[in-house]
Amino acid sequence: LRYKGQRGKAPLVVTLFDGMRLKDLRIGLITVDGRDARDVFSQINWGVITMYDGITFGGFNYIIPERNFIVVYGNKPNLEEVEKALRAHFQDDRGREIMGVLERLTRIETRWGPLYLYTDLDLADARRIVEGYQVISKYPEPIRYAHVIGRAVGMWREKS
């Protein structure tokens, strides 16, 4: 875990799928290690069931989902290391909020391997949704697409 001290911007990508087809995408820019991810997300989200690739974006900028969400982690975060990094760099409530989510992750088994979820949906429904989008890996396609697009945008921004 590396602290970047609120330097620079990172892309926040939201994908919209119709079945297995990418229907639309929106991109916003958030401050690295900032506190604007929630506001940016609220401007680019469609308000449907949302799968999040974790809750931290652009370092320790974060979104605590409010409704109709599935937070997905491919691996269980090292809670001790995350808490240590949060305490070392932030004197606000983000540590408590982030740790509150990470401590409530539930391990599920999928046909592609284990995932860790935090959701306000019925766990069986969340699993069904996640597995419905697993095509070539344990990461659901909406998350996989957003990750690939976000990396490409980030690399392009670094070169410009």
Residue ranges and their predicted role:
Residues 1-7, 13:
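Two-metal-ion RNase H-like nuclease active-site motif
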Residues 35-63:
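Short HxH-centered metal-ligating active-site micro-motif
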Residues 60-113:
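Long, charge-dense
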Residues 11-19:
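Short beta-strand elements
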Residues 2-3, 53-62, 74-78, 122-124:
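Gly/Ser/Thr-rich loops at beta-strand to alpha-helix junctions
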Residues 114-160:
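Charge-patterned, long linear interaction tracts outside catalytic cores
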Residues 19-45:
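Nucleic-acid-processing active sites and adjacent nucleic-acid-binding tracks
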Residues 13, 48-49, 68-70:
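Structural motif
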